[in-house]
Regions:
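NTP-dependent nucleotidyl-transfer catalytic core
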Residues: 1-290
């Protein structure tokens, strides 16, 4: 519930809300495109009418333009990301304290949907941990300060880098950017410190297999904080690929092309879903043929 992805979701919801009120702002191609974003915007309209409406010229003021839609080169991708970041900054400036409502509304709706879906699937989590809490309690800043005290941080080009190569990583990692913002890695370190400080015998991470390269840096950070790295375990989970009529179902969260667990359960039932997921070890690819 912290970081850029949540900001993008909040912005996407607000832009759809503006569109529902006749305010025409070009919707960024790299924002969240799914119909669920329109649903969240509609909920805002029902609850608050036009309270959060701002004029299009104010929203777009000072934002860099978008490249041609058919351009897929690296420069065009960077321009789209810069445009998105500028829109987020404008939203925060124009809405002021109301930005927190938009952000929280998007978070609450998606989190409630995830919780409900999992509960119906027979999966219950005792604790849901807030990433934002790591910042609100100052744990991220304390973590970076601890690493600095122990000599594991150096400054380069205005950014703070963790010497993760000293612990077997392929390169050092930024924990605080030159603009003062902390990276996702910094909050990951803080979260692991929190886990250890809660006194568990085992600290288990369940990650997607594409995060395999993340293990050395996290393990290195745990060692750098003088914590017992032997307690850290990482379980890698391969992707489940859905097939319908012999065709692979393409998925992209931002573009809105995906099949939810709820839709899958509705199509084949809870028992069949649970059976198929248990059919393979978590570190093996799963082809789920509908």
């Amino acid at each position: 519930d912290a970081g850029r992805q949540m900001d993008i979701l909040g912005l996407s919801t607000w832009l759809r809300y503006l569109d529902q009120h006749g305010v025409s702002v070009p919707f960024p191609p790299n924002a969240y495109q799914g119909s669920y974003v329109r649903d969240m915007a509609q909920q805002m309209t029902v609850a608050h009418c036009a309270k959060y409406v701002r004029p299009a010229e104010a929203v777009l003021a000072g934002t860099p333009g978008l490249p041609e839609a058919d351009r897929a080169d690296d420069e065009a991708k960077q321009q789209r990301e810069l445009h998105l970041d500028a829109l987020i900054a404008r939203a925060k400036e124009l809405l002021g304290p109301d930005w927190d409502y938009v952000h929280q509304h998007a978070l609450n709706e998606q989190l409630a949907d995830c919780r409900d879906d999992l509960e119906q699937f027979g999966v219950h989590f005792d604790v849901w941990f807030s990433e934002k809490a790591l910042y609100d309690t100052g744990l991220v800043a304390r973590c970076v300060a601890l690493l600095e005290e122990k000599g594991h941080i150096y400054l380069q080009n205005g950014a703070k880098w963790f010497r993760s190569t000293a612990f077997g990583d392929e390169k050092d990692r930024v924990v605080q950017r030159e603009n003062g913002l902390y990276t996702y890695f910094a909050s990951d370190i803080a979260y692991h410190l929190n886990k250890f400080e809660r006194g568990f015998d085992k600290v288990i991470n369940i990650w997607g297999a594409d995060h395999h390269g993340y293990i050395p840096r996290v393990s290195g950070a745990v060692k750098a904080l003088d914590l017992d790295a032997a307690k850290l375990q990482v379980a890698l989970v391969q992707f489940a690929v859905l097939y319908r009529n012999g065709q692979k179902a393409s998925m992209s969260t931002r573009s809105g092309e995906f099949v939810t667990l709820r839709e899958l359960r509705g199509e084949v039932g809870n028992d069949a879903c649970r059976f198929f997921y248990a059919l393979r070890k978590s570190d093996q690819h799963l082809d789920f043929d509908l």
